[in-house]
UniProtKB/Swiss-Prot annotation, chain A:
Primary subcellular site in the record, as a coarse category: cytoplasm
UniProt xrefs under Pfam families: Proteasome (PF00227), Proteasome_A_N (PF10584)
Protein name: Proteasome subunit alpha
Keywords: Cytoplasm, Proteasome
Bias (Acidic residues): 237-253
An example Gene Ontology molecular-function term: threonine-type endopeptidase activity
PANTHER family, per database record: PROTEASOME SUBUNIT ALPHA/BETA (PTHR11599)
Subunit (UniProt): The 20S proteasome core is composed of 14 alpha and 14 beta subunits that assemble into four stacked heptameric rings, resulting in a barrel-shaped structure. The two inner rings, each composed of seven catalytic beta subunits, are sandwiched by two outer rings, each composed of seven alpha subunits. The catalytic chamber with the active sites is on the inside of the barrel. Has a gated structure, the ends of the cylinder being occluded by the N-termini of the alpha-subunits. Is capped at one or both ends by the proteasome regulatory ATPase, PAN.
Curated annotation (Swiss-Prot), chain B:
Positions in coiled-coil regions: 12-70
Protein's name according to its UniProt entry: Proteasome-activating nucleotidase 1
Keywords: ATP-binding, Chaperone, Coiled coil, Cytoplasm, Nucleotide-binding, Proteasome
Family assignment from sequence similarity: Belongs to the AAA ATPase family.
Biased composition (Acidic residues): 1-12
Assembly and oligomerization: Homohexamer. The hexameric complex has a two-ring architecture resembling a top hat that caps the 20S proteasome core at one or both ends. Upon ATP-binding, the C-terminus of PAN interacts with the alpha-rings of the proteasome core by binding to the intersubunit pockets.
GO-annotated molecular function: ATP binding; ATP hydrolysis activity; proteasome-activating activity
InterPro entries assigned to the protein according to its UniProt record, in alphabetical order: 26S_Proteasome_ATPase, AAA+_ATPase, AAA_lid_3, ATPase_AAA_core, ATPase_AAA_CS, NA-bd_OB-fold, Nucleotidase_PAN, P-loop_NTPase
Source species of the chain: Halobacterium salinarum (strain ATCC 700922 / JCM 11081 / NRC-1) (Halobacterium halobium)
Family annotation (SUPFAM superfamilies): P-loop containing nucleoside triphosphate hydrolases
Amino acid sequence: MQGQNQQQAYDRGITIFSPDGRLYQVEYAREAVKRGTASIGVRTPEGVVLVVDKQTRSPLLEGSSVEKLHKIDDHVGAASAGHVADARQLVDFARQQSQVERVRYDEPIGVRTLTKSVTDHIQQYTQVGGARPFGVALLIAGVEGGEPRLFETDPSGTSNEWKAVAIGSNRGDIQEFLEDEYDAGLSVDDGIDLALRALNEGREDALSGDGVGVGIVDADTGTYRELAADESQSYIDDIEDAADDSDDDDDEE
Amino acid sequence: MTDTVEDVELPYDDSASQQDKLEALEEQLSTLEEENEEMRDRLLDANAENNKYQQKLERLSHENKKLKQSPLFIATVQELTDEGAVIKQHGNNQEALTEVTDELRATLEPGSRVAVNNSLSVVRQLDDEADVRARVMEVDDSPDVGYEDIGGLDDQLREVRETVELPMKDPGLFETVGINPPSGVLLHGPPGTGKTLMAKAVASQTDASFIKMAGSELVHKFIGEGAKLVRDLFQVARDHEPAVVFIDEIDAIASKRTDSKTSGDAEVQRTMMQLLSEMDGFDERGDIRIIAATNRFDMLDRAILRPGRFDRLIEVPHPNVGGREKIFRIHTRAMNVADSVDFGELAADTGDLSGADVKAICTEAGMFAIRDDRTEVRMQDFQSAREKLDQDSEPAAATDVSRTFA
């Protein structure tokens, strides 16, 4: 195919720019992110919601062993999409950083500070020869000074703060859905509801409590926790009921 | 003649009278004279015959010599000057100044094709014909496909017919409204959805000359040959107005231009540029409609997609349920199908399949019936065929890949 020949020479080395200023290996790493299932983050005034798709390939697989949601510190959680093993490395790094902060300053690490140190780490793998970039993106959610914060990291080492964001497969559709439906005044429950509906968008099979993971960082308590499968299921049921109701309304009209 | 013949048998008896002897001799003389005359005639005939054979011999030996001679070269006349003609040989592109007989000179003009011998003198003028390869692309025998053989693509077919048929049937309509008829349609869509089939139907249903070719035929080894073929192709089309040119798999030559330095790519691109200028360039295109088909729409160069070249970009999608049912009916027309076969159900059951897939199911179903030693194809056969095809097309399990990602 045309166009590939010239590209090939520049995607061999991670440290080599193409003539139009692109780092092909980093762009390929983003493709690895798209291979992962979707992870969604929604920030509300009451806290940050992380929802991940952890649909299992086999009914015999233990759902709890699918690593999509990670607790970083008491007040910080993360959702990943892409290369699982790479995600673990970054999560370990982030945990270490937050512990270093506690030992050094005796205070919980700021979410922005944590994100920056993680992305600095990621960035090194785009500038040093002999290595490859991280094939994973993270959503880092936490509370900083009572304020909920939501950051996204990218294989290039860029970080952005978001009100609501999706990473992983089908990202475009989900992000579009979030942009249409997001409201700044959502409660945490509304946030979970919104994220689950976004995840449901463009999925063929129905959501189930086992198939999703929900993590919440509560602004009041400043703690991160993950919902159990039956809790998630009740949120899903609520959505389905609401959908049925609106269907019924349609029928009546 | 003083030949004397001894011992001549005289036609009389010695005893006869003088008078009788004389008469007999006279009689003999006249017979001999007659014979002589006859012999002379035969001699003449033989001479003539001899001449004829002599000539034939000469002709044959001449021909024999000619056959042994080296063939003539083809060249194009570049220029006619007082000193002779400047010719350029085909192939090696060598130019030469050469002599031309006055007789030939009168008929020659710059651009004529001529045959030259070993010493490069012009032997004779050749027909100024377009490339043979372009000429053979004209379709004389219409394919045996009608519009009724196309299932489901009603909108697409209507658009194609509007572009191709309407301007020929009713050119006044366009004049009255004051628009130029659309000149080209590009059919694009996944494989097996009937793009070429539509073109075939158009070919058999219109009276216009139909010229078909595959994009890959335009790719040639030598620089300029592909472009020449494109030029000749449109020349052939112009000579046979109104005409429809169908280019199948146009992505072979019309893919996006890049900065690639490979000379092969560059040549393909030059061929495309010739196509661009033929389609909507400086020269009037004439009454020629163009249909092209591709399944790599994303690869096409933007220049070829602009209005004026392809006015209509028609997507040919996978058929919907109704379309599939129609396609089932079309492909089973000649089949001995049991009454119990429900095409509606089959169509509903075969989501995401293309027209070609449906055809494959019908063929497979027939095979199942044959294997079962039946001549009637039943619903069960169709279902088995569908399952078989499903298995064939199932992608390799991606579980190992997904294991790495979450």
